[in-house]
């Protein structure tokens, strides 16, 4: 069973490969394409134009032609999926999978976000997928971690993410969610007996549920 990915951060390839192994999936069945230029074009323009959405969807459909499922890992490009008509294989937004997983848990949801421009879209997304048991959605901008990540200060970056997760749990969060896939390695660094949710595992589990569960590893 083949899964294709459209990334805008090169480091996400390894993050998804590592997570796939923990879920019993075969890494040699994963195909990664990185298009950082699409995210950068949206950021430079300040809007997700119809032309950029069209280019994003062309990439997704090309990946879908050679896969049993496609995962879009960049939240910035996520709205393009809504304009796709029915496709032959599932196209899963990692951010939507995360929001849905958090919504099922319920209670007080705290989302850690590294990009200020993504705070409001993230809040709206999580509120849209909140179940009746969700009491609140709080999106916290942890500004310094994106700069640390881009400068390759990875250990300090993940330590800062975990510290923010610990603070959120201490403040009463029922569930803490990491908004960006590249944050996933910091999941196991959190304390307080709770494990934050990440979009990497959430997206892969969503594909497994839609396509065929553990048989994906065959």
Report each predicted region and the residues it spans:
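Non-catalytic structural scaffold of enzyme domains
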Residues: 1-218
């Amino acid at each position: 069973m083949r899964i294709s990915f459209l990334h805008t951060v090169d480091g996400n390839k390894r993050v998804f490969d590592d997570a796939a192994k923990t879920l019993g999936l075969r890494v040699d069945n994963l195909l990664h394409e990185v298009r950082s230029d699409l995210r950068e074009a949206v950021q430079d323009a300040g809007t997700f134009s119809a032309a950029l959405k069209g280019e994003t969807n062309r990439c997704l459909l090309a990946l879908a032609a050679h896969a049993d499922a496609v995962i879009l890992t960049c939240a910035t490009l996520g709205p393009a999926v809504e304009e796709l008509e029915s496709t032959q294989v599932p196209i899963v937004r990692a951010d939507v999978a995360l929001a849905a997983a958090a919504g099922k848990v319920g209670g007080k949801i705290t989302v850690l976000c590294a990009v200020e421009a993504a705070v409001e879209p993230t809040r709206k997304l999580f509120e849209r997928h909140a179940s009746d048991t969700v009491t609140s959605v709080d999106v916290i901008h942890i500004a310094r971690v994106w700069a640390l990540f881009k400068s390759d200060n990875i250990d300090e970056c993940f330590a800062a993410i975990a510290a923010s997760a610990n603070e959120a749990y201490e403040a009463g969060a029922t569930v803490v969610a990491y908004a960006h896939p590249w944050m996933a390695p910091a999941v196991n660094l959190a304390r307080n007996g709770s494990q934050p949710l990440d979009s990497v595992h959430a997206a892969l589990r969503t594909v497994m549920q839609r396509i065929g569960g553990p048989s994906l590893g065959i």
